[in-house]
Amino acid sequence: MGLCHGKPIEQQSKNLPISNEIEETPKNSSQKAKSSGFPFYSPSPLPSLFKTSPAVSSSSVSSTPLRIFKRPFPPPSPAKHIRALLARRHGSVKPNEASIPEGSECEVGLDKKFGFSKQFASHYEIDGEVGRGHFGYTCSAKGKKGSLKGQDVAVKVIPKSKMTTAIAIEDVRREVKILRALTGHKNLVQFYDAFEDDENVYIVMELCQGGELLDKILQRGGKYSEVDAKKVMIQILSVVAYCHLQGVVHRDLKPENFLFTTKDESSPLKAIDFGLSDYVRPDERLNDIVGSAYYVAPEVLHRTYGTEADMWSIGVIAYILLCGSRPFWARSESGIFRAVLKAEPNFEEAPWPSLSPDAVDFVKRLLNKDYRKRLTAAQALCHPWLVGSHELKIPSDMIIYKLVKVYIMSSSLRKSALAALAKTLTVPQLTYLQEQFNLLGPSKNGYISMQNYKTAILKSSTEATKDSRVLDFVHMISCLQYKKLDFEEFCASALSVYQLEAMETWEQHARRAYELYEKDGNRVIMIEELATELGLGPSVPVHVVLQDWIRHSDGKLSFLGFVRLLHGVSSRTLQKA
């Protein structure tokens, strides 16, 4: 549900014309759309949608035509199956879509007591309604006493009559917990308190009166200049990096969910609407399909995703900011979903050729369909497009913890290959790693231990870090028995091969690394020994799957084998090769 909307939803809907754009746009598959800023939950895409890619026309062009907008995006019409699933989630209809009588057995046994204060009426006086959605509405209000006396606030009102399933109740409980835990970041809407009575839950927050980011885009003629777009992206990335470090994924990032505090040009941007947010541990994946159709990541449609899904949404926002069009468009939801899965964003038409190469690269590295190759929020803040336009203050990045864990458990053969690759990194790439190394608090001698990882996270931990079980994951790393790392080995352990592979310079990196490996670490190795090094079991036909890893001329690791070794291997991946 939207928070602090600048104008009522009814007024917005009048400004949402039916698009008359042609239907030849690429299509894509399955995520839920939000009408007027509210969630729809979609089931997995029908297999029949993917027999052939509708993104490829007879001219074999697989890119999305430019879609310039001068008015707010027309929301896609919700498909019947999405409506049905959403209704079932909140208990408004049975699976066969028959109405559930008021007070039916579906609500028997549901505990709708949240433990919030019941003194809302004595603390706040409700003013006008500023937004309405499927499961509640948002009002402005004024504090009557206490620290907020006389202050304007926003109140999100969620009727308990809408909470007819345990899932719906848990969604509200989790939203309040996340807001309470994360409040305080300068780019996140300030949470004040939560109340309840017999009829409603009231979430009291900062009232943002500067309007939506979407409105600002439209006021500027549909797009931002590069300079102004950078300012917006830095604020978005800053708050998202903070959320991800705490183990929180927003799951509905879009221009409508970022508000300016005031109408002043220098007003800070605030992330709002955590109604779809959830906790996710670094080594776990979510599988429920939520979000808004234009901004949904491909892996969400495939029902296996993590914080990388937010980065895709940020990529869509960046694309819109810079060119004034959506990267994926179609007349229907299913068409949008097919475009997300199959089509490529258009970077050929104006204004892309006139934008800086760094700006184009920034967006491309966020809109990579392979989530493993996507930048994290902390990495994006270190991208050359943004470096220099803000004071470099990079937060800790959870991907470092994941990569180091894999590195420690890797074979000595792979570690030596990664060491060679680390020596090919450029200064901008090393800047990010140096920041992450410093955040871990190295000793005076320049070393970090596994305990440093836990200590660093604890410095910035919140209740959300505990609820997401991020601390459990970090504790696993801190308990690993491994020698101390200097910066050189840290770089080898913390670099992402997949992210390097997404760069245009990947081939040069790989070739140069192989040359270094040839000089320092390559040696004659038997297939059986290689299989042992890789930890492959007896069930793997090693002579079949590893034969092209070794050069027949001298028995040493081939370039192909070297690259595969960099990516890491398992019995499963080898058998698929």
Swiss-Prot record:
Query: Where is the segment annotated Calmodulin binding (CaMBD)?
Result: 410-430
Q: Which PROSITE patterns match?
A: PROTEIN_KINASE_ATP, PROTEIN_KINASE_DOM, PROTEIN_KINASE_ST
**Could you tell me which residues belong to the region Disordered?**
1-38
What is its subcellular localisation?
Membrane
Activity regulation behaviour: Activated by calcium and calmodulin. Autophosphorylation may play an important role in the regulation of the kinase activity.
Residues modified as Phosphoserine? 292, 334, 558
Which proteins does it associate with, and in what oligomeric form?
Answer: Binds calmodulin (CaM) in a calcium-dependent manner.
**All copies of domain Protein kinase, residue ranges:** 124-386
Q: Where does ATP bind?
A: 130-138, 156
- InterPro entries according to UniProt: CDPK_Ser/Thr_kinases (IPR050205), EF-hand-dom_pair (IPR011992), Kinase-like_dom_sf (IPR011009), Prot_kinase_dom (IPR000719), Protein_kinase_ATP_BS (IPR017441), Ser/Thr_kinase_AS (IPR008271)
Q: What is this protein called?
A: CDPK-related kinase 7
Q: What is the recorded membrane topology of this protein?
A: Lipid-anchor
**Could you tell me the keywords of this UniProt record?**
ATP-binding, Calcium, Kinase, Lipoprotein, Membrane, Metal-binding, Myristate, Nucleotide-binding, Phosphoprotein, Repeat, Serine/threonine-protein kinase, Transferase
Free-text note regarding domains: There are 3 contiguous domains conserved in the CDPK subfamily: a kinase domain, an autoinhibitory (junction) domain and a calmodulin-like domain. The autoinhibitory domain (391-421) inactivates kinase activity under calcium-free conditions.
State the residue spans of region: Autoinhibitory domain: 391-421
Per the Swiss-Prot or TrEMBL record, the active site comprises 252 (proton acceptor)
* Residue numbers binding Ca(2+) 1: 443, 445, 447
